[in-house]
Amino acid sequence: MQRSIFTLALLSTLALAAVPAAAAVDFGAEVVSRYVWRGTDVGNAISIQPGMSYNFSSVEIGAWSSWAINGGSANENNLYVSFTTGPVAIAITDYYFPAFTANDRFFRYGDGDAVHILEASASLARVDMPISLICAFNFSGDTENSFWIEGTYDLGEMDETAVSVTVGAGNGSYTTDTDPNLVSVGINLGKADYFASYILNPDKESTFLIFGKNF
């Protein structure tokens, strides 16, 4: 079933020659000084992060990846499907971590190989409210079935720079002892195509200052 879902997603994305007039496609990339994901430095290197998406009505199918420039460390190549109704979005994401070995073939799924992690998530974001929320749960590929919850508060603009604060907590693979804990507190700035974040992980007692640019 899992394999069928994402095979269908791939076929739908590749069928762009028959895109209806109401549909839209998009692509882009980011370059970041470090790839910090939910309070953890994933690659310990500058990373290039391309993405592409196909939107039709309330459905979006897309791919997003992160590639470290230090010779293949912490590569990630994800697929996702999302459905949005009003301020609520429901998504399934396939996190795939290719290391280019015989044990990380794309169609290997399950809790035992750790090459794919499948996540279900729900998010809430209203244009008339400064707060957005996301809850996520790993239902395959993660023996801990880790749970994540995150909130972002938009503080508005200062000197033409968007300012927000993000707080995230999780358990399982997100924490040092698998128990629920606060693992990410960040201050985020964005101006034009540039962005920066200062992130504290209270659980690991580590901090990061990252900078990036959108293309």
What annotation goes with each model-predicted range?
Residues M1-D26:
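Cleavable N-terminal export/targeting peptides
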Residues A22-F215:
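Outer-membrane beta-barrel proteins
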